[in-house]
């Protein structure tokens, strides 16, 4: 099975923020794909093209490092990603290097890391904003029982669900 999101073609230059990016954004579905080159400095803003605050940001270093995919998520709704996960590892919630989301940009953590803004790296990022009936992001607390499991209200019938435990290395 392949899941594909249509953004908006080949992309166009975006000069919002400290680091220029090439952005292909579909504001109707809240999906943006962007490419940028790192500058090795912390707390850098990068344009995402959505026109609204994303809820999830997924970043991968394409060159200049052998880093995992990093997933940031704002589960509190305050514009700061309070959850950070490595998608290809077994680590739990990964440290306190958080991204902040604005309507036109996201700001990288204050620390410099090749996973999101190394000086010699090129990056691809996927930004997702919640759209009623299309996407919903959140978290839940499992009960630890083997019954039917929790009910998670999304407001629609999802076709694609991503689950990853963030409080344990299991």
Mark where each language-model region is.
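Surface-exposed molecular-recognition determinants
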Residues: 1-170
């Amino acid at each position: 099975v392949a899941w594909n999101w249509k953004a908006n073609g080949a992309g166009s230059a975006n000069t919002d923020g400290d680091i220029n990016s090439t952005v292909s954004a579909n504001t109707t579905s809240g999906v943006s794909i962007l490419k940028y080159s790192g500058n090795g400095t912390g707390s850098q803003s990068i344009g995402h093209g959505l026109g609204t605050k994303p809820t999830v940001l997924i970043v991968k270093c394409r060159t200049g490092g052998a880093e995992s995919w990093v997933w940031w998520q704002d589960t509190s709704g305050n514009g700061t990603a309070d959850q950070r996960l490595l998608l290809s590892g077994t680590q739990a919630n990964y440290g306190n290097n958080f991204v902040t989301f604005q309507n036109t940009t996201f700001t990288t953590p204050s620390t410099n890391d090749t996973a999101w803004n190394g000086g010699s790296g090129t990056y691809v990022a996927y930004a997702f904003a919640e759209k009623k009936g299309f996407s919903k992001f959140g978290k839940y607390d499992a009960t630890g029982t083997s019954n039917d499991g929790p009910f998670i209200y999304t407001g629609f019938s999802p076709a694609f669900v991503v689950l990853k435990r963030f409080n344990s290395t299991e």
